[in-house]
Curated annotation (Swiss-Prot):
Belongs to the universal ribosomal protein uS19 family. The gene is rpsS. It comes from the Bacteria. PROSITE patterns: RIBOSOMAL_S19 (PS00323). Protein S19 forms a complex with S13 that binds strongly to the 16S ribosomal RNA. The lineage of its organism: Bacteria, Bacillati, Actinomycetota, Actinomycetes, Micrococcales. InterPro entries: Ribosomal_uS19, Ribosomal_uS19_bac-type, Ribosomal_uS19_CS, Ribosomal_uS19_SF. HAMAP family: Ribosomal_uS19. GO terms for biological process: ribosomal small subunit assembly; translation. Keywords: Ribonucleoprotein, Ribosomal protein, RNA-binding, rRNA-binding. This is Small ribosomal subunit protein uS19. Gene3D superfamilies: 30s Ribosomal Protein S19, Chain A.
Length: 93
């Protein structure tokens, strides 16, 4: 269920401080974060945020179409390797 409009978007304060500091200094260095729950706001446009996927940080470049989504949506946590095409063990039974 989406968040109430009267509350506004949730962004972790430590992440918001880093984004605002980058905007003030016109510095676009990569920001490393573990906050997958933070919503992408217009202030983040043009930044590259490295989102943790449980094992490593995935760099995500923020574009206009991403505003309103959560950071975790762009760093998948599970690796799908596909189904086995020719499984000889299953065929024998």
């Amino acid at each position: 269920m989406p968040r109430s409009l009267k509350k506004g978007p949730f962004v972790d304060m430590h992440l918001l401080k880093k984004v605002r500091a980058g905007n003030e200094s016109k510095d676009r260095n990569m920001i490393k974060t573990w906050s997958r729950r933070s919503m992408i706001i217009p202030e983040m446009l043009g930044h590259t945020i490295a989102v943790h996927d449980g094992r490593r940080h995935i760099p995500v470049f923020i574009t206009e179409s991403m505003v309103g989504h959560k950071l975790g949506e762009f760093a998948p946590t599970r690796t799908y390797r596909g189904h086995v095409k020719d499984d000889r063990k299953a065929r024998r039974r």
